[in-house]
Amino acid sequence: MRRTIATARFLPDHYNQLQWKALDELDSGVCDGLTYQEIKDRYPEDFAARDEDKYNYRYRGGESYRDVVIRLEPIIMELERSEDILIVTHQAVLRCIYAYFMKKDQSKSPWMNVPLHTLIKLTPGAYGTEEVRYEANIPAVSTWRGKGSTAKHENPAPGVM
C-alpha cells in the first residue's frame, strides 16, 4: 500500500482519503518482489501453473485473482452506493474492479490491460458504463502480459513470437 499512499499524497487536502485494506495488491506470497523472469527461474512449476490458469492460481503463501474478487465484494457494494470517487490502488485490484463495472467476466480480469499512470474514468449509465482514459505520460516499464504472452518489456529470443 506504500506506493498507492505515495501517489495519493498529491491529491488536494479537501479530498476525503480512506485507506481500505481490501484494496491492497494481490498477495504474491513467496514471489513478492520478484520479476516474472525470477519467478520463472526460481519457481518454474508455479510460473507454468499461473500461466495456465492465472485467475485461479494461488501463490504459495499468497492469493489468487479469485481471492481478490472475493475480498473486494464488500468494497464494490460500498462503491455502488457512493457518489464520485477516485480509487488509487494496484493493477490486479483495478482489473477486478474494472471487470465488475464494465460487466466483464471476472475470470478474464488477469489479462485486462490496465496501464500504469492512467486515470480511468468510469461513468455508469442506463445502457452501460462509459469509459474515458487519461494518460499521465510518465515513463514506466509495462509488465502487462496478455494470456500466453511474454511481458512487453521482456525480449523474446530472435525469431520467437
What is each of the regions a protein language model found here?
Residues 127-161:
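Eukaryotic N-terminal low-complexity, Ser/Thr- and Lys/Arg-rich leader segments
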Residues 23-25, 53, 125:
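Short, solvent-exposed coil/turn elements at secondary-structure transition points
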Residues 14, 42, 53, 81-82:
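Structured helix-beta-strand junction loops
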Residues 5-6, 73-130:
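Active-site-adjacent alpha-helix immediately C-terminal to a catalytic or transition-state-stabilizing loop
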Residues 1-48, 99-104, 109-121, 160-161:
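Phosphate-coordination/substrate-recognition cap region in phosphate-metabolizing enzymes
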Residues 1-11, 58-73:
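Loop-to-helix element that buttresses phosphate recognition and phosphoryl-transfer chemistry
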Residues 43, 54, 72-76:
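Short amphipathic alpha-helical/adjacent loop interface patches that line ligand
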Residues 46-66, 146-148:
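Short glycine/proline- and acidic residue-enriched helix-loop micro-motifs
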